[in-house]
Structures are given as C-alpha cells and as structure tokens.
Amino acid sequence: MREEVLKRILLIIGAILMAIICLFPFIWMIVVSFAEDPTFLGSPLVEYKSTLENYVRVLSDPTLHFPAYLKNSIIIASLVTLTTVSISSLAAYAVSRIEFKGRLLIPIFVLGLSMFPQISLVGYLFKFIEKLGWVNTYQALYFPYVAWTLPLSLWILLSYFSQLPKDLDEAAMIDGASRIKTLTTIILPLSAPALFSTALLVFIAAFNEFMFALLFTTDHRARTVPVGIALFQGVHGEIPWGSVMAASVISTIPLVIMALLFQKYIVSGLTAGALKGE
C-alpha cells in the first residue's frame, strides 16, 4: 500500500515538474510581451510595469508588417494542410487497401526522401524556383511545404487505415460503391481522429517553418510569421523584445489553445493505428 502511494506521489510530482518545464517558456513570453520596459530582464533596478503598447505596436506599426506576415502564414499553412491531407489520404488508402505490385515500396520511398535534411536541398530548390520566377511568392513556399509534410501525413494515415477492417470496403463495393465513394463515405469518417491530428500537425509544421521562408521570400508580400518576427528591429537596430514577444504570443497562443482543446482527438488519432484492433 505504501509503495503504491509513493509511486502515485512520484508520478504527480513528475507530472507537475513536466508541466512547469513545458509551460515556463510560454508564461515568460507572455510576461515579457506585457512589459513596458523589457530591460527589467537584465537589471534588478528596473521595475516591471505592464502595458498593451507592445501589442498595439505589433498590430498597427506599418514598418513591422506583422498582420501581413500572419495572413501569409495562415493562407499558406491552410493550403498546404488541405493539399497534403488530401493527397496522403488517397495514397494511404491505395497502399493499405488495394493490392498492386510494389505498393509497399511507396511509403518506404517517401520516408527515404524525407530523410534528406532541408539544407541539402535549398540550393537546388532556390535555383529551380528562381527560374520559374516564383521567388517571393506563395508558390515558392507552397510546393516545398507540401513535399516536406507529405511523408509525416502519409505515415500517420497509413498506419490508421491499415487497422480498419477490409470487410468495410468489400461490403461497400457489393452495394455498388466505387473506391472513391468508399473512401469518402466510410473510411474517412471512421478516420476522423487521424485526419484531424494529421491536419493539425501539418498546419503547425507549415506555419512554423523557417528556412525555406527565409531563403525564398524577400519582403512582406510572401514572408511568413517566423521570419518576420526574427527580422524585427528597433529604431537603432536593437531587438525590441517586447514587440517580438507580443508577436510570438499572437501567433503561438491560438495554436496552443487549439492543441489543448482537441488533444483527445490528436492522441487517439496518433495512437489508435498503433494498437491492434483499434
């Protein structure tokens, strides 16, 4: 009995410590974003005073272009998510449900391509994008992002689809349903948790991507939030930590809230495919 109580106490302490470690960066980011004078970070003599000035500046200062960065990130990430999940759903269904020669090599090939680091592809991609005249356009980020997020999406959905009984497909085809109709009316509704978790992970990955956005965009017309925040500068070239943190809060907190609200579906979508019979 004492051992069980001790284990329970240790688990609770571990969970609390983990929560503190995970939440501390966000809490600190919020604290600094409301600071009137961020120099309190390095001097105990500077009093902490809260203000909304940093948020007002980020949203209204025309030199920062933050609303444009946020719009670009949302549009690109949304398009990438829609495309990636759609393509990976079709591919995962074909590999998991249709017998054809070499089908098992497809996920291995896709996974192998994803093992190449981004930096090794940047030079070739930039030359290709430059020849197409896509530098500083949505296309310059859209297509690389789709290729970059497709392996993750395919593997998650493939592991989930593989656990669904094939009797469902056979019953649907006996009733005269085509493969596409079977996918859209039976498989996808049953795979809602996996689809949702995949879509959220793809959206976050595309929203937070930095390297391609830094190299393939030149100004606010196509630049995304991570690069835009990294390039924030004050009047004299200093880093405006208050504005940086305010912009980070605006762009990060909605994603965190969304992940917390739908964590049940995310966890079930990521784990169900790994459990036999799920």
Swiss-Prot record:
It comes from the Archaea. Coiled coil: none annotated. Keywords: Cell membrane, Membrane, Sugar transport, Transmembrane, Transmembrane helix, Transport. Gene3D superfamilies: MetI-like. Residues 70-262 form the ABC transmembrane type-1 domain. It holds the Pfam family BPD_transp_1. It is found in: Cell membrane. It is a multi-pass membrane protein. CDD domains: TM_PBP2. PROSITE patterns: ABC_TM1. InterPro entries: BP-dep_ABC_trans_perm, MetI-like, MetI-like_sf. One of its GO terms (biological process) is transmembrane transport. The chain crosses the membrane at residues 12-32, 74-94, 106-126, 141-161, 186-206, 242-262. One of its GO terms (cellular component) is ATP-binding cassette (ABC) transporter complex. Part of the ABC transporter complex MalEFGK involved in trehalose/maltose import. Responsible for the translocation of the substrate across the membrane. Belongs to the binding-protein-dependent transport system permease family. The complex is composed of two ATP-binding proteins (MalK), two transmembrane proteins (MalG and MalF) and a solute-binding protein (MalE). This is Trehalose/maltose transport system permease protein MalG. It comes from Thermococcus litoralis (strain ATCC 51850 / DSM 5473 / JCM 8560 / NS-C).
